[in-house]
Amino acid sequence: MTHQAPVPPSEKESFGERLQKALSARGPLCVGIDPHASLLLRWGLPDSVDGLRSFADTVVSALADRVAVMKPQSAFFERFGAAGVSVLESTIRQARQAGTIVILDAKRGDIGSTVQAYAQAYLSPTSPIAADAVTVSPYLGFGSLAPVIDEAEAHGGGVFVLALTSNPEGPSVQHARTSDGRTVAQTIIDEAAACNAKAPVLGSVGLVVGATVGDTGHDLSALNGPVLVPGLGAQGGAADDMRGLFRDLRGVVVPSYSREVLSHGPGKSGLRDAADRALSACQKALF
């Protein structure tokens, strides 16, 4: 992976435009920041706030000026309480300053003033925990996400909506049929596409589609937005799986690796080499 200059955010650019530029400049790769207790142990770090901080600082220092996207998993920071959230704030801030796009993996979903508060927490520029984009759950109805989508639009942020997840329990809900014959997942896909319909380049409302879902027959062709693809590497998905799944979506797919890269720490060169291998595999599969 060759070093690329940072991709600075611009208030005049939408999230979709910034993401597309980052993927073009640095290649189609997102690296998750998932400080599992087992990973901390593997790195020789204590399962504590100090271990969490050392882990996150090392990953950001090694990769944030090289990869297009990084994705901290909020839960692994939250488990340490306020001190862990403080580390998360610092991690997001440092990663963004280094030029990578940060998607906060929080999977929040609620209604009314509560979801509005989540939107302000994760997407308002005045929030200490603000990221470039956030993952959300639509299972209180897609319309419940309106405050998050509005907040994102107001500040040039992005939203990634869970659509087709790779956990075995997912299909019982996501593949269920609605009254008009579409699956629940297809209604989510179509609602996201409607949000992006007027975007001049790439819309800022994306979807989360697991790498291991297989060919489900869902139609993403009208999305005009990015697709975040977790589940690659240690979770069982392979880069080659994306060839069939996303054959009509080249250039907007954001493949995400976590343990497959993170397990090669704590040395920075090991992390960089693993990220290089993951990026090479994704480029071969998507181009």
Annotated model-derived regions:
Residues L207, A211-S256, E260-V261:
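A C-terminal functional module that forms or caps the active site or interfaces directly
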Residues V31, M70, D105, V134, ...:
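Conserved, mostly hydrophobic/aromatic
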Residues H3-P72, F77-S90, Q94-I103, D180, ...:
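Conserved N-terminal beta1-alpha1 strand-loop-helix module at the mouth
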Residues A37, A106-G206:
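Conserved anion-binding
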